[in-house]
């Protein structure tokens, strides 16, 4: 049984969010929740919400036992990019790319 949860259009760079996804992939859910709770990265808070949602989905929709769940997949895809301008000297401008992520966490039986 595989149950997933997704947070689309998260305002964080995929490169930064993937660092946190790599920490919890393959771990059991109790360990993953503790890792995210003690991580000081912004992405860990977003990933924690998605993980808790996936756990709740497994418990309520599938009747799964929380103690037997493990994080089978955790990945971050790139969403649309917001393009902004920063004014520079002599009437020029530089482009700023505000990157957006789609975070997906899948939990399943051990």
UniProtKB/Swiss-Prot annotation:
Pfam families: Ribosomal_L22. One of its GO terms (cellular component) is cytosolic large ribosomal subunit. One of its GO terms (biological process) is translation. Keywords: Ribonucleoprotein, Ribosomal protein, RNA-binding, rRNA-binding. InterPro entries: Ribosomal_uL22, Ribosomal_uL22_bac/chlpt-type, Ribosomal_uL22_bac/org-type, Ribosomal_uL22_CS, Ribosomal_uL22_sf. SUPFAM superfamilies: Ribosomal protein L22. GO terms for molecular function: rRNA binding; structural constituent of ribosome. Transmembrane segments: none annotated. Gene3D superfamilies: Ribosomal protein L22/L17. This protein binds specifically to 23S rRNA; its binding is stimulated by other ribosomal proteins, e.g. L4, L17, and L20. It is important during the early stages of 50S assembly. It makes multiple contacts with different domains of the 23S rRNA in the assembled 50S subunit and ribosome. The globular domain of the protein is located near the polypeptide exit tunnel on the outside of the subunit, while an extended beta-hairpin is found that lines the wall of the exit tunnel in the center of the 70S ribosome. PANTHER family: CHLOROPLAST 50S RIBOSOMAL PROTEIN L22-RELATED, LARGE RIBOSOMAL SUBUNIT PROTEIN UL22M. Part of the 50S ribosomal subunit. Belongs to the universal ribosomal protein uL22 family. This is Large ribosomal subunit protein uL22. It comes from Hydrogenovibrio crunogenus (strain DSM 25203 / XCL-2) (Thiomicrospira crunogena).
């Amino acid at each position: 049984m595989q149950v997933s949860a997704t947070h689309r259009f998260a305002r964080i760079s995929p490169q930064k969010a993937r660092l946190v996804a790599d920490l919890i992939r393959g771990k059991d859910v109790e360990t993953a929740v503790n890792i995210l709770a003690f991580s000081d990265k912004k992405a860990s808070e977003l990933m924690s919400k998605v993980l808790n949602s996936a756990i709740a989905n497994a418990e309520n929709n599938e009747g799964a036992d929380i103690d037997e769940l493990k994080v089978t997949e955790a990945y971050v895809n790139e969403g649309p990019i917001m393009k902004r301008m920063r004014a520079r000297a002599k009437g020029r401008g530089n482009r700023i790319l505000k990157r957006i992520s789609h975070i997906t966490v899948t939990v399943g039986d051990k």
